[in-house]
A protein has these predicted regions:
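Carbohydrate transferase catalytic cores enriched for Leloir-type hexosyltransferases
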Residues: 1-330
Length: 330
Protein backbone atom coordinates (compact mmCIF):
# COMPACT_ATOMS: atom_id res chain seq x y z
CA UNK A 1 0.00 0.00 0.00
CA UNK A 2 1.44 3.44 -0.91
CA UNK A 3 2.57 5.57 1.99
CA UNK A 4 -0.02 7.91 3.44
CA UNK A 5 0.75 11.63 3.15
CA UNK A 6 -1.15 14.11 5.31
CA UNK A 7 -1.21 17.81 4.36
CA UNK A 8 -2.40 20.58 6.68
CA UNK A 9 -4.89 22.45 4.50
CA UNK A 10 -6.85 24.05 7.35
CA UNK A 11 -6.28 27.53 5.86
CA UNK A 12 -8.26 26.55 2.77
CA UNK A 13 -11.30 27.60 4.82
CA UNK A 14 -10.21 31.22 4.28
CA UNK A 15 -9.93 31.29 0.47
CA UNK A 16 -9.22 35.03 0.17
CA UNK A 17 -6.17 34.98 2.46
CA UNK A 18 -2.67 34.41 1.12
CA UNK A 19 -2.41 31.04 2.86
CA UNK A 20 -5.89 30.10 1.70
CA UNK A 21 -4.84 30.76 -1.89
CA UNK A 22 -1.63 28.79 -1.35
CA UNK A 23 -3.63 25.77 -0.17
CA UNK A 24 -6.30 26.07 -2.88
CA UNK A 25 -3.84 26.23 -5.77
CA UNK A 26 -1.75 23.33 -4.52
CA UNK A 27 -4.85 21.24 -3.86
CA UNK A 28 -6.04 21.77 -7.45
CA UNK A 29 -2.93 20.03 -8.77
CA UNK A 30 -2.60 17.58 -5.88
CA UNK A 31 -6.08 16.24 -6.73
CA UNK A 32 -4.65 15.06 -10.05
CA UNK A 33 -1.84 13.08 -8.39
CA UNK A 34 -1.71 9.30 -7.99
CA UNK A 35 -0.04 9.59 -4.57
CA UNK A 36 -1.95 8.67 -1.40
CA UNK A 37 -2.66 12.28 -0.40
CA UNK A 38 -4.92 13.16 2.52
CA UNK A 39 -5.97 16.67 3.51
CA UNK A 40 -6.16 17.79 7.14
CA UNK A 41 -9.03 20.30 7.39
CA UNK A 42 -10.15 19.92 11.01
CA UNK A 43 -13.56 20.67 12.44
CA UNK A 44 -14.20 22.73 15.56
CA UNK A 45 -13.92 19.86 18.05
CA UNK A 46 -10.54 18.84 16.64
CA UNK A 47 -9.16 22.32 17.20
CA UNK A 48 -9.55 21.80 20.94
CA UNK A 49 -6.90 19.11 20.76
CA UNK A 50 -4.73 20.67 18.07
CA UNK A 51 -1.58 20.66 20.20
CA UNK A 52 -1.75 16.90 20.65
CA UNK A 53 -0.35 14.86 17.77
CA UNK A 54 -2.40 11.83 18.82
CA UNK A 55 -5.44 13.52 17.26
CA UNK A 56 -3.80 13.70 13.83
CA UNK A 57 -4.57 10.73 11.58
CA UNK A 58 -1.58 8.41 11.26
CA UNK A 59 0.60 9.05 8.23
CA UNK A 60 4.10 8.41 6.90
CA UNK A 61 4.55 12.08 5.97
CA UNK A 62 2.98 15.23 7.43
CA UNK A 63 3.32 18.59 5.64
CA UNK A 64 2.72 21.76 7.67
CA UNK A 65 2.18 24.26 4.86
CA UNK A 66 3.00 27.31 6.98
CA UNK A 67 5.28 28.04 9.90
CA UNK A 68 2.49 28.87 12.36
CA UNK A 69 0.55 25.64 11.90
CA UNK A 70 -0.36 24.38 15.40
CA UNK A 71 -0.42 20.76 14.26
CA UNK A 72 2.55 18.50 14.94
CA UNK A 73 2.89 14.79 14.12
CA UNK A 74 4.55 12.11 16.20
CA UNK A 75 8.09 12.88 15.09
CA UNK A 76 9.29 9.34 15.88
CA UNK A 77 6.87 7.78 13.41
CA UNK A 78 6.21 10.49 10.82
CA UNK A 79 8.42 12.47 8.43
CA UNK A 80 7.74 16.17 8.90
CA UNK A 81 7.88 18.75 6.08
CA UNK A 82 7.68 22.41 7.13
CA UNK A 83 7.05 25.33 4.77
CA UNK A 84 8.13 28.78 5.99
CA UNK A 85 6.66 31.80 4.22
CA UNK A 86 8.07 34.67 6.28
CA UNK A 87 9.13 35.76 9.76
CA UNK A 88 6.63 38.60 10.05
CA UNK A 89 5.14 37.11 13.22
CA UNK A 90 8.59 37.00 14.84
CA UNK A 91 9.23 40.67 14.06
CA UNK A 92 5.77 41.68 15.25
CA UNK A 93 5.88 39.62 18.46
CA UNK A 94 9.38 40.87 19.29
CA UNK A 95 7.88 44.36 19.47
CA UNK A 96 5.49 43.13 22.17
CA UNK A 97 8.09 41.20 24.16
CA UNK A 98 7.06 37.68 23.14
CA UNK A 99 9.66 37.10 20.43
CA UNK A 100 11.76 34.64 22.46
CA UNK A 101 8.79 32.33 22.99
CA UNK A 102 7.94 32.42 19.29
CA UNK A 103 11.56 31.64 18.36
CA UNK A 104 11.62 28.66 20.71
CA UNK A 105 8.45 27.20 19.17
CA UNK A 106 9.64 27.64 15.59
CA UNK A 107 13.12 26.30 16.37
CA UNK A 108 11.46 23.16 17.76
CA UNK A 109 9.67 22.65 14.43
CA UNK A 110 12.84 23.33 12.43
CA UNK A 111 14.82 20.83 14.52
CA UNK A 112 12.31 18.04 13.86
CA UNK A 113 11.66 18.73 10.17
CA UNK A 114 13.02 16.27 7.63
CA UNK A 115 12.72 18.94 4.93
CA UNK A 116 12.15 22.71 5.22
CA UNK A 117 10.85 24.59 2.19
CA UNK A 118 10.87 28.36 1.73
CA UNK A 119 8.90 30.50 -0.72
CA UNK A 120 11.93 32.71 -1.50
CA UNK A 121 15.69 32.79 -1.08
CA UNK A 122 15.18 35.89 1.05
CA UNK A 123 13.02 33.99 3.55
CA UNK A 124 15.56 31.18 3.64
CA UNK A 125 18.36 33.62 4.49
CA UNK A 126 16.23 35.37 7.11
CA UNK A 127 15.51 32.05 8.82
CA UNK A 128 19.21 31.17 8.72
CA UNK A 129 19.96 34.50 10.39
CA UNK A 130 17.61 33.90 13.31
CA UNK A 131 17.59 30.11 13.69
CA UNK A 132 19.84 27.07 13.58
CA UNK A 133 19.10 25.35 10.28
CA UNK A 134 20.66 22.36 8.54
CA UNK A 135 21.05 23.67 4.99
CA UNK A 136 21.13 20.14 3.59
CA UNK A 137 17.43 19.77 4.33
CA UNK A 138 16.29 23.10 2.84
CA UNK A 139 14.67 23.88 -0.53
CA UNK A 140 13.21 27.02 -2.12
CA UNK A 141 9.92 26.53 -3.99
CA UNK A 142 8.41 29.71 -5.43
CA UNK A 143 4.68 30.36 -5.27
CA UNK A 144 2.67 30.60 -8.47
CA UNK A 145 0.35 33.04 -10.22
CA UNK A 146 -3.30 32.39 -11.03
CA UNK A 147 -5.12 35.47 -12.27
CA UNK A 148 -7.72 33.81 -14.47
CA UNK A 149 -8.62 34.91 -17.98
CA UNK A 150 -11.78 36.98 -17.56
CA UNK A 151 -11.88 40.44 -16.00
CA UNK A 152 -14.85 42.37 -14.66
CA UNK A 153 -15.02 46.17 -14.31
CA UNK A 154 -14.93 47.04 -10.59
CA UNK A 155 -17.34 49.49 -8.94
CA UNK A 156 -14.62 52.18 -8.83
CA UNK A 157 -13.44 53.06 -12.34
CA UNK A 158 -10.63 55.66 -12.45
CA UNK A 159 -11.18 58.70 -14.64
CA UNK A 160 -7.47 59.38 -15.30
CA UNK A 161 -4.39 57.24 -15.94
CA UNK A 162 -3.89 55.35 -12.68
CA UNK A 163 -1.44 53.35 -10.62
CA UNK A 164 -2.55 50.17 -8.88
CA UNK A 165 -1.56 48.40 -5.68
CA UNK A 166 -3.11 45.59 -3.66
CA UNK A 167 -2.63 44.07 -0.22
CA UNK A 168 -4.12 44.08 3.26
CA UNK A 169 -3.99 47.68 4.48
CA UNK A 170 -1.49 47.27 7.33
CA UNK A 171 1.45 49.41 8.53
CA UNK A 172 3.99 46.90 7.17
CA UNK A 173 2.62 47.51 3.66
CA UNK A 174 3.72 51.15 3.97
CA UNK A 175 0.89 52.42 1.76
CA UNK A 176 0.72 55.77 3.57
CA UNK A 177 3.89 56.96 1.78
CA UNK A 178 1.86 56.97 -1.43
CA UNK A 179 -0.22 59.92 -0.19
CA UNK A 180 2.58 62.48 -0.40
CA UNK A 181 3.97 60.74 -3.49
CA UNK A 182 0.65 61.13 -5.32
CA UNK A 183 0.71 64.88 -4.64
CA UNK A 184 3.88 64.98 -6.75
CA UNK A 185 2.27 63.41 -9.84
CA UNK A 186 -1.01 65.32 -10.44
CA UNK A 187 -1.75 63.59 -13.75
CA UNK A 188 -2.42 60.23 -12.06
CA UNK A 189 -4.97 58.60 -9.81
CA UNK A 190 -4.17 55.71 -7.45
CA UNK A 191 -6.19 52.60 -6.59
CA UNK A 192 -5.20 50.59 -3.50
CA UNK A 193 -7.27 47.42 -3.02
CA UNK A 194 -7.32 45.23 0.07
CA UNK A 195 -8.99 44.53 3.39
CA UNK A 196 -9.35 47.66 5.53
CA UNK A 197 -10.06 46.20 9.00
CA UNK A 198 -6.95 47.70 10.64
CA UNK A 199 -6.99 51.22 12.14
CA UNK A 200 -4.13 52.07 9.77
CA UNK A 201 -6.66 52.14 6.91
CA UNK A 202 -8.88 54.63 8.74
CA UNK A 203 -5.84 56.80 9.50
CA UNK A 204 -4.88 56.73 5.83
CA UNK A 205 -8.40 57.68 4.72
CA UNK A 206 -8.36 60.62 7.12
CA UNK A 207 -5.06 61.87 5.67
CA UNK A 208 -6.33 61.43 2.12
CA UNK A 209 -9.26 63.68 3.00
CA UNK A 210 -7.05 66.23 4.79
CA UNK A 211 -4.75 66.45 1.76
CA UNK A 212 -7.66 66.97 -0.63
CA UNK A 213 -6.97 63.77 -2.55
CA UNK A 214 -10.38 62.10 -2.33
CA UNK A 215 -10.80 62.46 -6.11
CA UNK A 216 -7.43 60.83 -6.84
CA UNK A 217 -6.51 58.33 -4.09
CA UNK A 218 -9.00 55.50 -3.60
CA UNK A 219 -8.95 52.78 -0.94
CA UNK A 220 -11.45 50.47 -2.61
CA UNK A 221 -11.49 47.65 -0.04
CA UNK A 222 -11.75 43.97 -0.93
CA UNK A 223 -12.17 43.08 -4.60
CA UNK A 224 -12.68 39.75 -6.34
CA UNK A 225 -10.21 38.15 -8.76
CA UNK A 226 -11.87 39.33 -12.02
CA UNK A 227 -11.96 42.92 -10.68
CA UNK A 228 -8.31 42.69 -9.65
CA UNK A 229 -7.44 41.49 -13.15
CA UNK A 230 -9.28 44.50 -14.62
CA UNK A 231 -7.14 46.88 -12.55
CA UNK A 232 -3.95 45.09 -13.61
CA UNK A 233 -5.01 45.20 -17.27
CA UNK A 234 -5.84 48.91 -17.24
CA UNK A 235 -3.27 50.42 -14.85
CA UNK A 236 -0.39 52.52 -16.13
CA UNK A 237 1.93 50.92 -13.56
CA UNK A 238 2.01 48.83 -10.39
CA UNK A 239 3.42 50.34 -7.19
CA UNK A 240 4.27 48.42 -4.01
CA UNK A 241 6.19 50.15 -1.17
CA UNK A 242 5.93 47.23 1.30
CA UNK A 243 8.48 46.86 4.09
CA UNK A 244 7.88 43.18 4.96
CA UNK A 245 7.33 40.45 2.38
CA UNK A 246 8.25 36.80 2.28
CA UNK A 247 7.44 36.62 -1.43
CA UNK A 248 5.28 39.42 -2.85
CA UNK A 249 2.58 37.72 -4.91
CA UNK A 250 1.03 40.96 -6.27
CA UNK A 251 4.42 41.81 -7.79
CA UNK A 252 4.49 38.51 -9.69
CA UNK A 253 0.87 39.03 -10.77
CA UNK A 254 1.53 42.52 -12.14
CA UNK A 255 4.69 41.22 -13.81
CA UNK A 256 2.69 38.62 -15.72
CA UNK A 257 0.78 41.47 -17.41
CA UNK A 258 4.03 43.27 -18.24
CA UNK A 259 3.24 46.32 -16.10
CA UNK A 260 6.01 48.73 -15.09
CA UNK A 261 6.87 47.78 -11.48
CA UNK A 262 7.79 50.36 -8.85
CA UNK A 263 8.78 48.56 -5.67
CA UNK A 264 10.38 48.97 -2.29
CA UNK A 265 13.93 47.60 -2.32
CA UNK A 266 13.23 45.84 0.99
CA UNK A 267 13.06 42.14 1.89
CA UNK A 268 12.10 39.72 -0.92
CA UNK A 269 10.93 42.27 -3.48
CA UNK A 270 14.18 42.65 -5.48
CA UNK A 271 14.38 38.85 -5.73
CA UNK A 272 10.85 38.59 -7.13
CA UNK A 273 10.83 41.82 -9.17
CA UNK A 274 14.20 41.19 -10.80
CA UNK A 275 16.38 43.60 -12.79
CA UNK A 276 13.62 45.17 -14.90
CA UNK A 277 11.64 46.58 -11.96
CA UNK A 278 12.31 50.04 -10.53
CA UNK A 279 13.12 50.33 -6.83
CA UNK A 280 12.63 52.94 -4.12
CA UNK A 281 15.65 53.10 -1.80
CA UNK A 282 13.78 55.56 0.42
CA UNK A 283 10.30 57.03 0.56
CA UNK A 284 10.87 60.78 0.30
CA UNK A 285 8.10 62.09 -1.99
CA UNK A 286 10.43 64.00 -4.35
CA UNK A 287 12.73 61.01 -4.71
CA UNK A 288 9.82 58.63 -5.33
CA UNK A 289 8.47 61.00 -8.00
CA UNK A 290 11.86 61.08 -9.75
CA UNK A 291 12.17 57.27 -9.71
CA UNK A 292 8.64 56.96 -11.07
CA UNK A 293 8.89 59.55 -13.86
CA UNK A 294 12.31 58.32 -14.94
CA UNK A 295 11.07 54.73 -14.92
CA UNK A 296 7.97 55.50 -16.96
CA UNK A 297 10.14 57.27 -19.54
CA UNK A 298 12.65 54.40 -19.57
CA UNK A 299 10.11 51.56 -19.79
CA UNK A 300 10.07 49.79 -23.16
CA UNK A 301 8.40 46.93 -24.99
CA UNK A 302 11.61 44.94 -24.41
CA UNK A 303 11.29 45.39 -20.64
CA UNK A 304 7.61 44.51 -20.80
CA UNK A 305 8.38 41.27 -22.62
CA UNK A 306 11.21 40.38 -20.24
CA UNK A 307 8.90 40.87 -17.26
CA UNK A 308 6.24 38.64 -18.79
CA UNK A 309 8.85 35.97 -19.48
CA UNK A 310 10.22 36.23 -15.93
CA UNK A 311 6.74 35.73 -14.48
CA UNK A 312 6.78 32.16 -15.84
CA UNK A 313 9.11 31.31 -12.93
CA UNK A 314 6.08 31.60 -10.67
CA UNK A 315 3.84 28.69 -11.64
CA UNK A 316 1.50 26.71 -9.36
CA UNK A 317 1.71 23.55 -11.47
CA UNK A 318 5.48 23.62 -11.20
CA UNK A 319 5.32 24.34 -7.45
CA UNK A 320 2.87 21.48 -6.88
CA UNK A 321 5.11 19.14 -8.88
CA UNK A 322 8.08 19.96 -6.66
CA UNK A 323 6.09 19.34 -3.47
CA UNK A 324 4.80 16.03 -4.86
CA UNK A 325 8.37 15.04 -5.65
CA UNK A 326 9.30 15.76 -2.03
CA UNK A 327 6.46 13.59 -0.74
CA UNK A 328 7.48 10.74 -3.00
CA UNK A 329 11.20 10.80 -2.22
CA UNK A 330 11.32 11.68 1.48
Amino acid sequence: MPKKILIDFEKIKDPYSGLGQFCSHLKFYFDQSQLNLNYWIPGKWQKLAKKCHHFLPKSAVFHAVHQDSPYLPNFKKTKYILTIHDLNALYEQTQFGSGDYYKKKLQHKIDHASVITFISEFTKEEVRRHFKVDLLKTKVIYNGISLGEHSTPPPKIPTKPFLFSVGTILPKKNFHVLIDFLKQIPDYQLIVAGTTFHSYAAEMQKRIEEEGLTDRFFLVGTIDEPQKLWYYQNASAFIFPSLLEGFGLPVAEAMSLGLPLFLSDKTSLPEIGGPDAYYFKNFEPDYMRDVFLTGMQDFSIEKKNRLKERSKMFDWKQAASRYLELYENI
